[in-house]
Structure formats: structure tokens, C-alpha cells
């Protein structure tokens, strides 16, 4: 059991018959009454987000989530197929689990899958990935100093803003957390 005053961003708990991840929390001290903890949780199975307020004396059941290394193989309809790096078993994960990570995944990308027992909850990409630009407008001569940006479509279909000097066919390094261009690879 964990006290609600010990909650932090990313803490995973079991409540109301589901698995939840804490996205945000804040302590509120009341004038005469006890302190309250205002939280925002994301359901790890459905993705829904709820706001909850707890008394500072309440406790929640914390859970242990194991991270498994897997390799992305290919899309299969509405699912994505991954291979467990230890057992070489193939695992199908739905769009609700992969969510926004799909736009930065290319074949053979290694990811970490959060597992609770035998159930996959979410995936984590490496912080940076190298992807090829498949489509972007050509840079105009003299634009390399101006510091402007232009949209570029990556091989996975994601669109990122890149500097004007970056051309089609260039490999670029992208931050998967923010979706921003970092540098040429």
C-alpha cells in the first residue's frame, strides 16, 4: 500500500478495479481541515483520464510493472506485431496500447513494453530515433542562415518541423517524447 501523499508522476496504482498511472498531483492544505491531494490519473487499459481528490490519509494499492525489451516487426491490420527479445515469441499489441508511439516506429525498432503479469499496458520508445525524410519542400538558396523551418514527412508518416537546409532523403534524429527535430544523423 502507498499513501496518496507519496504519489509522483508515473506512479502506477490499482484502484476501482483497474490499473492507473498518475499523470499529475498536487497537495492542497485546507485552512481548518486536513490536507487534500488532487490527482490526475490515466487508465492504463482504456486510456481514459480522470481527476480524483483524496484525503491525505488515504492509501492506494501500488503495482509492480515489469519492462520487457521487444522489437517492432510489422503492422498487422489494427495491431502491431512485436518480438520478445528473450523468448523470441511474437506478440500482437493493439492501437490503444501503442498509441502515439506508432508514428516514430519503423521495422526493427527496439522498444520497452510495460507488462503487468501477462498483460501489456504501454510501450516506451528510445528517447531519440533516426528516420529518413521521404518528402519535404526544397530549401531556397540563402535560407540556411535565416533559421526558419519547414514541414518534413518521415518514413513512418510522421510530420516534423526541420531547418530549411535539410533535404529529402536525409537521415534525421528526432526526439520521440516531443516529436522535434534534433539534428542530422
Curated annotation (Swiss-Prot):
InterPro entries attached to this UniProt entry: Elong-fact-P_C (IPR015365), NA-bd_OB-fold (IPR012340), Rib_uL2_dom2 (IPR014722), Transl_elong_fac_P/YeiP (IPR020599), Transl_elong_KOW-like (IPR013185), Transl_elong_P/YeiP_cen (IPR001059), Transl_elong_P/YeiP_CS (IPR013852), Transl_elongation_fac_P (IPR011768)
UniProt superkingdom: Bacteria
Pathway note: Protein biosynthesis; polypeptide chain elongation
Assigned GO CC terms: cytoplasm
Gene Ontology MF, one: translation elongation factor activity
Keyword field: Cytoplasm, Elongation factor, Protein biosynthesis
GO annotation (BP), single: peptide biosynthetic process
Stored CDD domains: S1_EF-P_repeat_1, S1_EF-P_repeat_2
The family this protein is said to belong to: Belongs to the elongation factor P family.
Primary role: Involved in peptide bond synthesis. Stimulates efficient translation and peptide-bond synthesis on native or reconstituted 70S ribosomes in vitro. Probably functions indirectly by altering the affinity of the ribosome for aminoacyl-tRNA, thus increasing their reactivity as acceptors for peptidyl transferase.
Record NCBIfam families: efp (TIGR00038), PRK00529.1 (NF001810)
Protein name (Swiss-Prot/TrEMBL): Elongation factor P
Amino acid at each position: 500500500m502507498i499513501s496518496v501523499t507519496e504519489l509522483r508522476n508515473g506512479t502506477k496504482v490499482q484502484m476501482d478495479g483497474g490499473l492507473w498511472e498518475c499523470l499529475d498531483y498536487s497537495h492542497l492544505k485546507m485552512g481548518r481541515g486536513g490536507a487534500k491531494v488532487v490527482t490526475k490519473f490515466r487508465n492504463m487499459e482504456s486510456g481514459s483520464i480522470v481527476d480524483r481528490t483524496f484525503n491525505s490519509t488515504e492509501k492506494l494499492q501500488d503495482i509492480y510493472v515489469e519492462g520487457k525489451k521487444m522489437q517492432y516487426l510489422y503492422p498487422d491490420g489494427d495491431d502491431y506485431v512485436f518480438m520478445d527479445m528473450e523468448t523470441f515469441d511474437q506478440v500482437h499489441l493493439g492501437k490503444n496500447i501503442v498509441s502515439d508511439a506508432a508514428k516514430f516506429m519503423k521495422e526493427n525498432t527496439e522498444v520497452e513494453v510495460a507488462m503487468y503479469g501477462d498483460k501489456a499496458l504501454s510501450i516506451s520508445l528510445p528517447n531519440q530515433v533516426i528516420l529518413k525524410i521521404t518528402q519535404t519542400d526544397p530549401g531556397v538558396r540563402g535560407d540556411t542562415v535565416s533559421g526558419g523551418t519547414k514541414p518534413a514527412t518521415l518514413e513512418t508518416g510522421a510530420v516534423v518541423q526541420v531547418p530549411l537546409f535539410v533535404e529529402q532523403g536525409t537521415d534525421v534524429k528526432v526526439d520521440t517524447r516531443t516529436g522535434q527535430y534534433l539534428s542530422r544523423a
